[in-house]
Amino acid sequence: MYVIELALKLSPLPVSVQRKALADAEAVYQQVRKCLERGQPHLLELSCEKVEDKKVTVLVSEIVAVQLYEKTAATGGSKRPGFSFET
């Protein structure tokens, strides 16, 4: 399972959706990046594959960052998101 996480202005908690396949997650990640670059559309609606009825619409101008990472069941959590100097 892959998580696409959005950091929003003035919000301590991120908004996230999940995709089962890396290619699908990468497509959502690129879609969000393009919206950030262009500033269009004003609203972006995302849905989640894990929770089928989960949908979220965000104001593109309020997105600060987007990240993509793999969630692993074996470790009971997920890989540490973001960047780390540890190997």
Curated annotation (Swiss-Prot):
Q: Which InterPro entries match?
A: UPF0367
Q: Which domain of life is it from?
A: Bacteria
Q: Which family does it belong to?
A: Belongs to the UPF0367 family.
Name it.
Answer: UPF0367 protein P9303_26451
Organism, by scientific name, is Prochlorococcus marinus (strain MIT 9303)
